[in-house]
Amino acid sequence: MLSFLSSNLSSTRQSLAQVLNFALVLSTAFMLWKGLSVFTASSSPIVVVLSGSMEPAFQRGDLLFLWNRSPRAELGEIVVYNVRGKDIPIVHRVVRTFPQIEGKAKKVKEVTEASSVPPNMLLTKGDNNIADDTELYAKNQDFLHREEDIVGSVRGYMPMVGYVTIMLSEHPWLKTVLLGIMGLMVILQREQ
């Protein structure tokens, strides 16, 4: 009887240790993500290119590293933005800037680097697209606000690494298979 209680206690202890290890892995990943978010000043410091609109600069599945500490975006800079009301990151190039004058947007010629007017409003376009992004913006929005809409500027990338994310979102059954394999590995590891 005592050996039964001892083995039960040992099994419970092992299960608790596995749960705590799993929680430790999750909390470490979360803390690293939040730390990276604070360091880059971006709510999403790493994003995956979801379409071919930026080819040949970036391919679908490329993993992008963002930085959002620059107060202004320059012409030609590649930025990631979210459309208001939607949570889909769009990666496109700044093709025009508009200075903010008395709270309203005023179209002017493209701002050059020598200009002293801070460009707070941007127009973007995918390198592989024919037209600019005004059709993608929210209703009654003709430009992006640098402070409100921009998630970050691209500072680096890793080709094709993000394709796993795309495959998992396009084929939901792969998530089930992956979770099943992970669960099977936990069960098999426990038996050893």
Swiss-Prot record:
Segments of this protein annotated with the region C-terminal short (CTS) helix: 177-188
Annotated SUPFAM superfamilies: LexA/Signal peptidase (SSF51306)
Claim: 4Fe-4S is one of the keywords in the record: no
Residues in compartment: Cytoplasmic: 1-18
Family label: Belongs to the peptidase S26B family.
PANTHER family: SIGNAL PEPTIDASE COMPLEX CATALYTIC SUBUNIT SEC11 (PTHR10806:SF6)
Protein name (database record): Signal peptidase complex catalytic subunit sec11
Native organism: Neosartorya fischeri (strain ATCC 1020 / DSM 3700 / CBS 544.65 / FGSC A1164 / JCM 1740 / NRRL 181 / WB 181)
Gene that specifies this protein: sec11
